[in-house]
Amino acid sequence: SCYYDLRFVCFNNINWIGNGLTLPSGPLRENINNLKNYNHIFLNGNLENLDAITRKLEKINPNLTIHIGEYIPSNINEFSKNDNFIVFSGIGNHQTFVRMIKNYQLNVVREFEYPDHYNYSTNEIDKICNEAKNLNCKIITTEKDYLRISKNNINLDQIKYIKSNLKIKDEEKLINSIIKL
């Protein structure tokens, strides 16, 4: 058994604990009651559901230090609020990505959600591009998906990506908790 000075766990604040079950039946890697063994928790996403999640966490482990992270797009100014968009991604939290885009008042007309680490075929990308043409939309994906597609020699002329960074709220609290060691 290993001893850790600090134990962190991370959740997306939209998906949170999903159906509450562990793998393979649910998204959790261990039972939610094991949060009693952790010092710190990261809730990342778009600042939704934080109060309800925080109350539940405090019931399980009142000693948890909760850190909040928000995804911030760094190139959002490259996209016009006057345009319509089709969004696609193959990431673990597609809805977090879509909500981030919508929070910046971009009009998402259609979205395509694929499994995490998805390997897109040329036909699938062509389908998205044709749909965008038919709906007079521009196409947005994640930087991660864009890079994955670019390795497959797929034409990327119509596809743009959002660069996003995780901004830790109250970063000083996190740094101080690490320095205390």
Mark where each language-model region is.
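Short, charged/polar "capping" segments at the starts of alpha-helices
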Residues: 47-55, 95-96, 146-151, 170
